[in-house]
Swiss-Prot record:
Gene3D superfamilies: tRNA-splicing ligase RtcB (3.90.1860.10). It comes from Homo sapiens (Human). The modification Phosphoserine is found at S300. Catalytic component of the tRNA-splicing ligase complex. This is RNA-splicing ligase RtcB homolog. Belongs to the RtcB family. Binds 2 manganese ions per subunit.
């Protein structure tokens, strides 16, 4: 029996201007409450989605995000609450922008591939340069072309970094350490990666032959979808101290943002795990509200296999971003006829947006070991946290928020409040407002390209027809999303960047 929209509203309560509570009973079997962070504009989108669903209009086969946050709150072993960040939108199982933590000491607690997503360790890396916008403007087209030539892009693109099966095994196990050994990374790059670019529990044997076959040719490639490399300039500095620690000292300074993940390999790891977990759920009699929330007990063989395979896919993504960093450094060096070192092409930070990790958090006054699922959300640890690099001990961890093609991006820093409210987690980007199919129907790709050109943005796209799926109109406003997190206190704004060139799959 489905409830009317007004009945649904009985279960929703506004805590403050940026946060709503989802009370138990909104969906069956909720173990904990849900919350979601919004501002006025984003709130309207969330409630419209719920209203449409009550009228029987689905969200491209997914439940509305609010329902998905509720269903995650019903998973065995969840602690504290199920959290929706301001860029939350419907996804497979978990909404994208939904995070949740599970108690590692609870034998019933689960791990769910839908809580990580298909593009395991999809993430963002930001490089700085000592160039100014005035240095780059005259050679902008040339630079965009050089990056497009150096970095393989598009759906079926193949990597240029030589890889054989043995290399792949080692890369899956070693992450950035592999790139370092092979000469594709600088030693300091590693310090500025989440997890130092290597998840230690990775086991290449838990990655299927099919996944490896998909992953081998794609290493060091950009892929399609929402993946891109952007040449950006610093548009605004909100926190000068934090910016200086990141090597950013003036407006107009040029940066490069790389947004990519584990390509076909991560997708296959997730698919394989979902099949295995369907069986494990029957065996262990695990009940979930939504079939897409297939999961397994953390301690079960299926749970452990997935975590080891997921870590290997995570390492693959870090190697991938390292390879693209290497190619970006080459492209810049070529155009400016100097060395990457002389251009100060250092990694500011590299964050993951889709990952599950074992972390220590204080819940109800007690320190607990939790498996934190972050899907379409970003780790945002506060100052003095032992897991962040020495350079950022006083500022808090840098958090990289990619906007959409042709809109601004942000660098945020983690806060103590975020640590207590959201397990040290904040938003990850703009969050879709229109489905991919709707975007293709509503927008014409030439209009999108022309609009970017009018904004003075150089663009190189491998598949122009995919451009409208990623047009700014298809997304929520990234500034709304970032400001909501800032006002809620779960992360603070440090730097705003705007694009001058986009390279895209």
């Amino acid at each position: 029996m489905s409830r009317s929209y007004n009945d649904e509203l009985q279960f929703l309560e506004k805590i403050n201007k940026n946060c709503w509570r989802i009370k138990k009973g909104f969906v069956p079997n909720m173990q904990v409450e849900g919350v979601f962070y919004v501002n006025d504009a984003l709130e309207k989108l969330m409630f419209e989605e719920l209203r449409n669903a009550c009228r029987g209009g689905g969200v491209g086969g997914f439940l509305p995000a609010m329902k998905q946050i509720g269903n995650v709150a019903a998973l065995p072993g969840i602690v504290h609450r199920s959290i929706g960040l301001p860029d939350v939108h419907s996804g497979y199982g978990f909404a994208i922008g939904n995070m949740a933590a599970f108690d590692m000491n609870d034998p019933e607690a689960v791990v769910s591939p839908g809580g990580v997503g298909f593009d395991i360790n999809c993430g963002v890396r930001l490089l700085r340069t000592n160039l100014d916008e005035s240095d780059v403007q005259p050679v902008k087209e040339q630079l965009a072309q050089a990056m497009f030539d150096h970095i393989p892009v598009g759906v079926g693109s193949k990597g240029v970094i030589p890889m054989n099966a043995k290399d792949l095994e080692e890369a899956l196990e070693m992450g950035v350490d592999w790139s370092l050994r092979e000469g594709y990374a600088w030693a300091e790059d590693k310090e500025h990666c989440e997890e130092y670019g290597r998840m230690l529990q990775a086991d290449p044997n838990k990655v299927s032959a099919r996944a490896k076959k998909r992953g081998l040719p794609q290493l060091g490639t950009l892929g399609a979808g929402n993946h891109y490399a952007e040449i950006q300039v610093v548009d605004e500095i909100f926190n000068e101290y934090a910016a200086k620690k990141m090597g950013i000292d003036h407006k107009g300074q040029v940066c490069v943002m790389i947004h990519s993940g584990s390509r076909g390999l991560g997708h296959q790891v997730a698919t394989d795990a979902l099949v295995a977990m369907e069986k494990a759920m029957k065996r262990d009699k695990i009940i979930v509200n939504d079939r897409q929330l297939a999961c397994a007990r953390i301690a079960s063989p299926e749970g452990q296999d997935y975590l080891k395979g997921m870590a290997a896919a995570g390492n693959y993504a870090w190697v991938n971003r390292s390879s693209m960093t290497f190619l970006t450094r080459q492209a810049f060096a070529k155009v400016f006829n100097t060395t990457p070192d002389d251009l100060d092409l250092h990694v500011i930070y590299d964050v993951s947006h889709n990952i599950a990790k074992v972390e220590q958090h204080v819940v109800d006054g007690k320190e607990r070991t939790l498996l934190v699922h972050r899907k379409g959300s970003t780790r945002a640890f506060p100052p003095h946290h032992p897991l962040i690099a020495v350079d950022y001990q006083l500022t808090g961890q840098p958090v990289l928020i990619g906007g959409t093609m042709g809109t601004c991006s942000y660098v945020l820093t983690g806060t103590e409040q975020g640590m207590t409210e959201t397990f040290g987690t904040t938003c990850h980007g703009a969050g879709r407002a229109l489905s991919r199919a709707k975007s293709r129907r509503n927008l014409d790709f030439q209009d999108v390209l022309d609009k970017l050109a009018d904004m003075g943005i150089a663009i190189r796209v491998a598949s122009p027809k995919l451009v409208m799926e990623e047009a700014p109109e298809s997304y929520k406003n990234v500034t709304d999303v970032v400001n909501t997190c800032h006002d809620a206190g779960i992360s603070k704004k440090a730097i705003k960047l705007r694009p001058i060139a986009v390279i895209k799959g």
